[in-house]
From Swiss-Prot:
Residues 1-21 form the signal peptide. This is Inactive leucine-rich repeat receptor-like serine/threonine-protein kinase At5g24100. The keyword ATP-binding applies. The lineage of its organism: Eukaryota, Viridiplantae, Streptophyta, Embryophyta, Tracheophyta. GO terms for molecular function: ATP binding; protein kinase activity. It comes from Arabidopsis thaliana (Mouse-ear cress). The chain crosses the membrane at residues 252-272. The keyword Disulfide bond does not apply. Glycans are attached at residues 53, 146, 158, 167, 197, 202. Residues 273-614 are cytoplasmic. The protein kinase domain is predicted to be catalytically inactive.
Length: 614
């Protein structure tokens, strides 16, 4: 009996420690991934911080890191354009055994191909393009049975293209362009391959039959024999004469001049027609449903030309021309190329440019403001971006990054899927998802914006571009203001298009130059915003000339029809009449014609918070 009890005791003890060890192993996986990432970070040069906070969760706060749906393992690492330099520390990334996607392109990484990456058996896509890796590639890829994308373009790899690529039977995309591969191309029988680029190497021989379907352009810039498209034969004038097709040299010269004249004439006509069409398009630009940012942004070739500018200012900033400049704390990791290829949805057009919703490679969604008519120098633009980017307040939408090149000026913000205050106030109708805003939500919008503006004013700055389309809701459910400081970068707003009229409708009467905004003029614009929120009326309404909310509200009040001012949605709310009147009085005081008679934002915040408490 004693022996039986001992057996049961040890068996239970075995189960306890065994299950504890198993539990420790399972829960330790994410900790192991975390340590692998930290070992990678601590052993590689990274002039720009990756913002991997050791005290915060890996899966939700570390830029570039993606975990599985349960948050137990790291499955993707996206660090393109993250300013990583040097050799990848061995035994770091390769410890992420559940990794499926690895993107380290557009950095300054060097050394041989990281052989330990072949240990990543779950890998589906790897992108190491646009770095400085060198040497030959491994020959055996038997462990990469799940790989679909292999992108090694623009490095310094050499040697022959491995015949082992033929074992990557799931491969869909293979890019080895702009390296120094030599020798003949192996016969890669990969029926699932859809994209291939072997251009600009030192390859010789002919194109294998299995790869001819990709066309000659996929193999250009090599020493290959193109059997299906031989180069045109060069026929001398003597041979032409022998065949009875001799034309004298003066005649040829005359024909050439005539042809050139016709060509130049046609080109001139085409340019003029395109210019006229472009001018008309800019005046009545339609709202596209979806487009690529690449259609509007410069190519890498165009951006690279900026480095050749002789301007001293350009030379000083040469190292930053093709970069996305991030601010501290930005939970993003991408470069200009990511923006060029990002899927983009047009959100709206304002007087300072157009806004897009962009989906990045790692599925993160951002809002990109493409600025237009920037008149300041690059130095002044960057200075203003630094000022705006360093405004830190929960009620001011943070500027996450910006791009400053000769061709483009871009600002990157977090994308708000709920939409702006303008959209939520004036959405088309209920069947399109528009839900009328209740009293509490409108009040919290105004409290948040007031606090954000108050903070901006304490920095001796003015916002200058307050309107409902620039107001969003933060994570705490209060208003948040975006796009501060833009008027300083452009010419005065005087145009009569709809976007300009909306800005001018919010403008204080004393402001004759939109670049000369003040805290007092911000308060006037905020007063318009409050009246818009209380009345539910769009300042542009259905009429081209819109309405003057201040005049309309004062007119209604003077006729003692104050109750007619408020949006019906607010009137239906019980027990808020006194609060509505108090907020209306605050709005009208903010829109006083004399700046000195307007309350400051401290007083505005106090009044709004008092209304909320009551």
């Amino acid at each position: 009996m004693s022996r039986g009890r001992s057996f049961i005791f040890y068996f239970v003890l075995f189960l306890f420690f065994g299950s504890s060890a198993l539990y420790s192993q399972v829960t330790g996986d994410l900790a192991g991934d975390r340590q692998a990432l930290l070992d990678f970070l601590n052993n590689i040069i990274h002039p720009r911080s990756l913002a991997w906070n050791t005290s915060s969760p890996v899966c939700t706060t570390w830029p570039g890191v993606t975990c599985d749906i349960d948050g137990t393992r790291v499955t993707a690492l996206h660090l393109p354009g993250a300013s990583l330099l040097g050799v990848i520390p061995p035994g770091t990334i390769s410890r992420l055994s559940e990794l499926q996607i690895l993107s380290l392109r557009s950095n300054g990484l060097r050394g041989p191909f990281p052989i330990d990456f072949l240990q990543l058996k779950k890998l589906k896509a790897i992108s190491l393009g646009n770095n400085r890796f060198s040497g030959p590639l491994p020959s055996d890829y038997a462990t990469w049975t799940n790989l679909t994308v292999l992108d090694l373009y623009s490095n310094r790899f050499n040697g022959s293209i491995p015949a082992g690529f033929a074992n990557l039977t799931g491969l869909v995309s293979l890019n080895l362009a702009k390296n120094s591969f030599s020798g003949e191309i192996p016969d890669l029988n990969l029926p699932g391959l859809r994209r291939l680029n072997f251009s600009n190497n030192n390859l010789t021989g002919s194109i294998p039959n299995s790869l001819k379907r990709f066309g000659n352009s996929a193999f250009s810039g090599n020493n290959l024999v193109f059997e299906n498209a031989p180069p045109p034969a060069v026929v001398s004038f003597k041979e032409q004469k022998k065949n009875g097709i001799y034309i004298s040299e003066p005649a040829i010269l005359g024909i050439a001049i005539s042809v050139c004249f016709v060509i130049f004439f046609v080109i001139a006509v085409v340019i003029i027609v395109c210019y006229v069409k472009r001018q008309r398009k800019s005046e009545t630009e339609p709202k596209p449903d979806k487009l690529k940012l690449a259609k509007k942004m410069p190519s890498e070739k165009e951006v690279s030309k900026l480095g050749k500018e002789k301007n001293i200012e350009d030379m000083e900033d040469k190292s930053e021309i093709n970069k996305v400049m991030f601010f501290e704390g930005s939970n993003l990791a991408f470069n200009l190329e990511d923006l060029l290829i990002a899927s983009a949805e047009f959100l709206g057009k304002g007087v300072f440019g157009m806004t897009y919703k962009a989906v990045l490679e790692d599925s993160k969604v951002i809002a990109v403001k493409r600025l237009k008519d920037i008149v300041v120098s690059r130095k002044d633009f960057k200075h203003q971006m630094e000022i705006v980017g360093n405004i830190k307040h929960e009620n001011v939408a943070p500027l996450r990054a910006y791009v400053c090149s000769k061709e483009e000026k871009l600002m990157v913000y977090d994308y708000d899927s709920n939409g702006s205050l303008s959209l939520r106030l004036h959405g088309k109708n209920a069947d399109e998802g528009h839900v009328p805003l209740n009293w509490e939500t409108r009040l919290r919008f105004m409290i948040g914006v007031a606090k954000g503006l108050g903070h901006i004013h304490t920095q001796n700055l003015a916002h200058g571009n307050i309107k409902s389309s620039n107001v969003f809701m933060n994570s705490e459910g209060y208003g948040c203001i975006s796009e501060a400081g833009l008027p300083l970068l452009t010419n005065p707003v005087v145009r009569a298009d709809s976007s300009a009229r909306s800005v001018l409708r919010y403008r204080a009467p004393e402001v004759t130059d939109t670049r000369r905004s003040t805290p007092e003029s911000d308060i006037y614009s905020f007063g318009i915003l409050m009246l818009e929120t209380l009345t539910g009326r769009s300042i542009m309404d259905d009429r081209k000339e819109g309405i003057d909310l201040v005049v309309w509200v004062n007119d209604v009040i003077s006729k003692q029809w104050t109750g007619e001012v408020f949006d019906l949605e607010l009137v239906k709310t019980p027990n808020v009449e006194a609060k509505l009147l108090q907020m209306l009085q605050l709005g009208t005081s903010c829109t006083a014609m004399v700046p000195a008679k307007r309350p400051d934002m401290v007083k505005v915040v106090e009044t709004l918070e008092e209304i909320e408490r009551d």
